[in-house]
Amino acid sequence: ELPGEVDVVSDLGTGGGIPGISIGITTNITVNLIDVKEKRIFELSRLIKILNNNNVFAIQDDAYNHIKKGGFFVSRCFISSEKVINSLKTDKNTTYLVSSNGEDLDYDSNLFHVKHENFKINKDDIRHIDVINVK
């Protein structure tokens, strides 16, 4: 569940639209699927039209341009947690949910709050997500 004050979620380096499409289907939040590749955006636009989903948008752009603007971001494979911390501007309205490898991060705890979440996808596989907030 996303915090009530989130109006727009940007799925950076979306690829096939995961997790952005799922967020768009299950919420009324505006979801921007951002990817630099024209073919991906074309296919995602077709999928959005088939789903008749009016709160999800496919945008062809460099995801790093959006990181610099701040906001609420999700990413499955686009960027590592370490690169997120190095790329984020210190905007207190920035939150980033990113899949990770579960390793400890080297970051300035005065600037960032990082919460590591682990979850099982079956009895043997664990996945990791880092929730990174600018303080």
Language model regions located:
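Conserved class I S-adenosyl-L-methionine
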Residues: 5-15
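S-adenosylmethionine
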Residues: 22, 32, 36-135
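Glycine-rich helix-loop-beta junction characteristic of Rossmann-like nucleotide cofactor-binding loops
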Residues: 1-5, 65-67
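N-terminal glycine-rich "phosphate-gripper" loop used for MgATP/nucleotide binding
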Residues: 13-16, 77-79
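Conserved SAM-binding loop of SAM-dependent methyltransferases across substrates and taxa
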Residues: 16-28
